[in-house]
């Protein structure tokens, strides 16, 4: 992760004060505190515990005040939302790693000194104001940075208390939306991605900027989406704090702030009713697909095209899926007079993929056989050439490795060559040579929640088969589920072109794809520009496409259908 360097840096550990509301704490705060225990460059030295005047009210008085201020239906809608959320957690959040996001922890479980303050909520607006005595109390602690662990927005002197200001994690896309309730509105609006931003606020005006932004595929339900974005974002809060001590307090190079002063908006009863209908429709469609034995099924097509920029995809020649299987992730290659297409060959019966190869000759094609078959899943057969030798880097994420295989006899005989990385959650790797270095692009899951579609990481080495790759200074170089995961890679003269996948709502894998030109790549910089977008509209009834391959006039693409499968 890259953080702009500034003049003011510190050599000791960064002292952090964590601002939390009084009461039980959510799993995200627990996760950050736990990660801080192994931090090298920072420590959470104090919990700044906020208590508000209205928290002294009993339950009946609080309900009366809310009804008087906001109307009768607001507390009813809140109660309904809690009920929906609890049901979704029970039914849909099965993974213990995700479910832990909703665990609650008493303040006494955190063995960190606690400083109690009573900020003032203004009658209008969202900016919490701290009283002078509380500000002096915090100043006396010698804290370097405050970390915001609650939902409010700050104003006034609290922004000047620490040299590094306040670091705040904002869920949602504050660039375009002013509605609150993190992770809900993205599901309700069926948006393909759910975003978060980590920003730093400095000075009375709250100036500063965004330290980083990221997005992940939007999950089908509110509870799933909230768990996933919570787990993903807290990993990067920890990493950011690790790097902040050496980066300094300067705001030079920060992204434009995504802060909005629009008031938070919780869903009304009408919105919640519509949300339930949408969720039931998704569940009903999935039940119908199961009962009718329908499943997602990929297919592959190819064609000849003088230029990759203007293929007539609708005229692609489709390779029929074999019984009980599907073909995906095509990579075409020419050697001599032989034209072939390597594919992921997935078997529904074994629930595992292998690598197969088809020979192509004009409108005709036929299966040559299996290229690689391992006791684990294989896909994405990326091929590259070094000194007239061919190597394949297929996806081997099931065993937590990035592996390399060498061609013994083209195109069918390949053997294991070397493991480039171990103990990594990485998929769809591209390897290429540029400016005296070998580069490796792959998508990681830093949070261990199974999201391998959002973070593009770059590495470099002096050797293509090194097992010691240096990470790029700005990793992840792309943090966006609509453009991070690779779907191919090829050259057009001196131009480097990376195919990227665009994930859809409900974690629809490979809804569409695009092609980006890599304009600049070195150990400190990564810059790419989208030059083409391809939608799933070139074959009837398809719902996705996610791999594009081009080699010397031969082009291949894949597509996704929902159809009956006999396993």
Kindly give the residue locations of the regions a language model identified:
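One-carbon transfer enzymes
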Residues: 2-378, 382-391, 401-407, 418, ...
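Beta-rich, blade/repeat-based domains predominating
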Residues: 328-331, 379-384, 427-432, 485-490, ...
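Residue-level signature of beta-propeller blades and closely related beta-rich strand-turn architectures
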Residues: 345-347, 396-398, 444-446, 502-504, ...
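Trp- and S/T/G-rich repeat-edge/linker motifs of beta-rich repeat architectures
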Residues: 365-367, 412-417, 469-473, 523-534
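Short loop/turn segments immediately following beta-strands, especially the blade-tip
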Residues: 407-411, 461-467, 517-527
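Loop/turn-rich, solvent-exposed surfaces of beta-rich toroidal or solenoidal domains
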Residues: 437-465, 481-517
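Conserved blade-ending motifs and adjacent loop-strand segments that build the rim/top face
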Residues: 473-488, 524-546
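Blade-level signature of beta-propeller repeat domains, shared across WD40, Kelch, NHL, RCC1
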Residues: 512-518, 539-567
